């Protein structure tokens, strides 16, 4: 039987095709849970025992819950990312090929598996900046129709397609919008969807998105497949854990950053000052002393959550033989000698202790020594605000496909681990010593 949390997560992913939609959905959940919204441009007046959140760029969000007894506080931080590899629609997007075809001009966002985007119905989603009453207002849009398709070349015209697959994003990956179409047809569709005049639209951040819904499958319903599992699965798990856990002596923080898939080097990315800015402003409200802020950070702990590679059933040779991770076998701790992951002996020990308390199994991932592997957000965030940190994720197949696969049980494992984490208090008590208190 599939846990209700898994069904809820799949609905969450289906309803949020872009980072902007994900952030808005998290915002709505927090508001319904009683969190108060803050603006970075306004003065903050925080109170012990209260819950808050703040957004940046409409695509990143940090939520936090203030403990009641903050004389010796620290931060419990968990982070994930809101974006996924896809195709961004360029300005001056329409390409008209006489009276026969109208295409959209796009460019790759992140490291997607191109072939998975072909020969399937697609649509358009993102945010649109609209002029309303003298202000520029951000509006979400997701055209709920089969609108586009990227056609592959028939094997009769490309006999090497199954042997030498190679895709030029400027040639092979441009989506077909229709036959002959009037100029500005995409803008007309979006204006109609938002019920605004075309000249009110001043800007946009629009992306291609798949139309296929998430599903549960397998002979025992043991697998889930969906777009954007990386990393909305971790966003959902952290958010649920934040809402379920509480620590009277700690400040629990959930940070969801945009632009991880393109390096995080934006104002709303993990490499920005967003996390530092929020933690420092919280600290200034607790006690306006930098000394107390630095003391708190020294005792703080962070989980950087970004999905991990499961052993591939057809290609197990891509996995380190002694560090095999499988779907439905629990949360993955990721380790890298070159520090692409933040995990070290201390942080892995803390993760192991918390997992044992939560009754959650842990697995360990390391790349083969002859493979470079990917990177994530934890080490970038740590360059701005440094604390003990461990990189984790949930095991999945086909990472960066437009339709990925994971285990049906693992989301619940992450929620339980995050609940335990957010129900704990950390304290540096001596040289090489970090106490992990049950709150």
Per-region residue spans from a language model:
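N-terminal hydrophobic/helix-forming segments and targeting peptides
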Residues: 1-439
């Amino acid at each position: 039987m599939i846990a209700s949390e898994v069904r809820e997560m799949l609905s969450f992913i289906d309803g949020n095709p872009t980072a902007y939609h994900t952030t808005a959905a998290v915002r709505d959940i927090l508001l319904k849970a009683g969190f108060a919204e803050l603006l970075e441009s306004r003065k903050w007046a925080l109170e012990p025992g209260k819950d808050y959140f703040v957004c940046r760029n409409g695509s990143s969000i940090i939520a936090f819950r203030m403990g009641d007894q903050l004389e010796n506080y620290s931060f419990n931080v968990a982070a994930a990312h809101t974006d996924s590899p896809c195709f961004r629609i360029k300005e001056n997007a329409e390409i008209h090929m006489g009276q026969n075809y109208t295409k959209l001009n796009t460019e790759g966002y992140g490291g997607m598996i191109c072939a998975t985007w072909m020969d399937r119905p697609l649509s358009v989603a993102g945010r649109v900046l609209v002029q309303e009453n003298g202000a520029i207002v951000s509006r979400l849009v997701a055209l709920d129709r089969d609108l586009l398709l990227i056609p592959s070349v028939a094997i009769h015209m490309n006999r090497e397609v199954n042997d030498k697959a190679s895709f030029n994003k400027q040639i092979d990956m441009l989506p077909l919008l229709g036959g002959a179409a009037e100029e500005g047809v995409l803008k007309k569709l979006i204006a109609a969807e938002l019920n605004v005049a075309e000249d009110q639209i001043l800007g946009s951040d629009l992306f291609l998105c798949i139309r296929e819904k998430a599903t549960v499958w397998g002979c025992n319903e043991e697998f889930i497949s969906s777009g954007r599992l990386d990393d909305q699965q971790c966003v959902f798990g952290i958010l649920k854990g934040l809402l379920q856990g509480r620590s009277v002596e700690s400040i629990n923080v959930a940070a969801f950053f945009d632009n991880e898939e393109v390096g995080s080097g934006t104002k709303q990315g993990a490499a920005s000052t967003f996390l530092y800015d929020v933690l420092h402003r919280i600290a200034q409200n607790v006690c306006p002393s930098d000394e107390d802020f630095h003391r708190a950070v020294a005792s703080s702990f962070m989980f950087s959550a970004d999905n991990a590679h499961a052993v591939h059933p057809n290609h197990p040779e891509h996995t380190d033989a002694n560090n095999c991770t499988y779907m439905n076998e629990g949360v993955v701790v990721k380790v890298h000698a070159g520090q692409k992951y933040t995990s070290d002996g201390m942080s892995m020990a803390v993760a192991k202790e918390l997992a044992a308390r939560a009754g959650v199994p842990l697995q360990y991932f390391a790349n083969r020594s002859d493979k470079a592997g990917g990177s994530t957000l934890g080490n970038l965030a740590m360059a701005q605000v440094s604390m003990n940190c461990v990189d984790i994720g949930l095991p999945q197949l086909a990472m960066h496909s437009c339709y990925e696969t994971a285990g049906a049980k693992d989301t619940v494992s992450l929620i339980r681990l995050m609940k335990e984490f957010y129900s704990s208090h950390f304290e540096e008590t001596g040289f090489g010593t970090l106490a992990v208190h049950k709150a």
